[in-house]
Amino acid sequence: MIQGIYSALSALRALGQRLGVTANNIANMDTEGFKKSKAVFEEASPYGVNVTIRRIETQGFPLPSEEGINKVCESSNVDIKEEMINLITVPHAYAANLKSVKAEDEILGTLLDIVDR
């Protein structure tokens, strides 16, 4: 029983990290040469999720520089569509895990009530 709560809490922490990475990517999308990051989830033993933050090194688009006509700088490699998908899906996954914690809590409460009789 308790393992379900641990798994859900681990997922909540991981989703919080993914949301933080997404927010950082969006905040820096107009920064020259910024490289986006990605939160990668991996199964943790015995229960839960490990998160690895990886920097994505793909190049952005070339932009004309303000320093001169012959100079070129690089845009960020942030894809706003990808980041918006994260902003939509993460809260739904977060809510689902919260419901899981609540259900486990109610089940444990019921079991304790039965044992207490």
What are these regions (language model features)?
Residues 1-117:
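Amphipathic alpha-helical polymerization modules
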